[in-house]
Swiss-Prot record:
Keywords: Cell inner membrane, Cell membrane, Membrane, Transmembrane, Transmembrane helix, Transport
Gene Ontology molecular function: carbohydrate transmembrane transporter activity
GO cellular component, one term: plasma membrane
Cellular localization per UniProt: Cell inner membrane
Record-annotated membrane-spanning stretches: 31-51, 70-90, 115-135, 144-164, 193-213, 217-237, 253-273, 290-310, 330-350, 353-373, 375-395
Topology in the lipid bilayer: Multi-pass membrane protein
Domain of life: Bacteria
Organism of provenance: Haemophilus influenzae (strain ATCC 51907 / DSM 11121 / KW20 / Rd)
Annotated family: Belongs to the TRAP transporter large permease family.
Coiled coil start-end: none
Protein name: Putative TRAP transporter large permease protein HI_0050
Pfam families for this protein: DctM
Amino acid sequence: MLLSASIMLYHLDMFDTQLITENFVMGTNNFPLMAIPFFMLTGEIMKHGGISERIINFATSMVGHIKGGLGYVAIISGLIFAGLSGSAVADTAALGAILIPMMISKKYDGARSTGLICAAGIISVVIPPSIPMIIYGITAGASITKLFMGGTVPGLLMVVGLWVTWKILYRNNDTSLERKQTGKERWVAFKKAFWPLLLPIIIIVGLRGGIFTPTEAGVVAAIYAGIVSIAYKGLTFSKLKDVFIGTIKTTSMVMFVAASAMISAFAITVAQIPTELVQTIKGLTDSPTILMFIIMLFLLLVGCVMDLIPAVLIFVPVLLPVLRAYNIDIAYFGIMMVINLSIGLITPPVGTVLYVGSGISKLGIGALSKGIAPFLFVYAIIMMLIVFFPEIVIVPMNWLS
């Protein structure tokens, strides 16, 4: 991204090392970006602090006994994890490390089970707190709180879609069932998972009530997760090194991409690409709905060959003038863009979440592609449903914000 932007500026006779350096620094000199390392830290604490096991045990106590029960455990756990870290890769790794071996040992289809867990993992980029939505909000100048609140209903629709699809796939399957737990056992499992379950509620209520900003929400989440993990005796001093190293690695990658994208956005702007794009698209259609449909199809293709965060940083500056020309709500579009590109995380050949699942299950990408196909289909339907009925997002987003 940095190289291509530099080449473009050179071609435009605007290559200047001081200008490039200034834009690079400006790319990270943004207060809301501080939320990213804290949410990354929350995910690492959850991974190393024993929180994952408590959440999965609670979900198992509730639905593990029904046919295909471990699939429902994965879906419920994915929803809860989504409200904790905001990272699809972290959530998929945490879920998969426990559930994939368990499901395979219970005679569940390996490819389909891994596909479900990967599909559940990407809910974390839609449900608040979402790291890609923070990136989008900063790039587009949209309210991050509004984006967070607007992602709630689509995220729940994705959960319902996975639930119905899994029910159809496993309606006649005789997999090993977990023992139905008693009310007392469920209560014990709930008590053990209570404090982690409280974190998503704290974040949503805090943002909705104006108690803290999205950046402060990241700090609250990290401190809260740390206190809970220490109280559970899951996070020890020996594990802190791994927690901080993991946080530093992922944060530095995201920040470098964000800084490089600022140079790319500058090059795209001075080349007048957005202006040309507006004029071209206006000749195709006058309908905002048809325009959204065309853009969503385009972004689906982009998601197959490019990771989510670079795609957001590259294409938002290009598409923003088009959205304004058609009076499309930029917060609504941001939610749609994140949902769309998140599908690319579980689509070959670049799908990073799919490779996480492959690494855990030891299955090839070809086999996983077949296993995840039904869930991709459902996600595509949900996305198009929101394109043609934007009120599904806009009404609750405005109310919750």
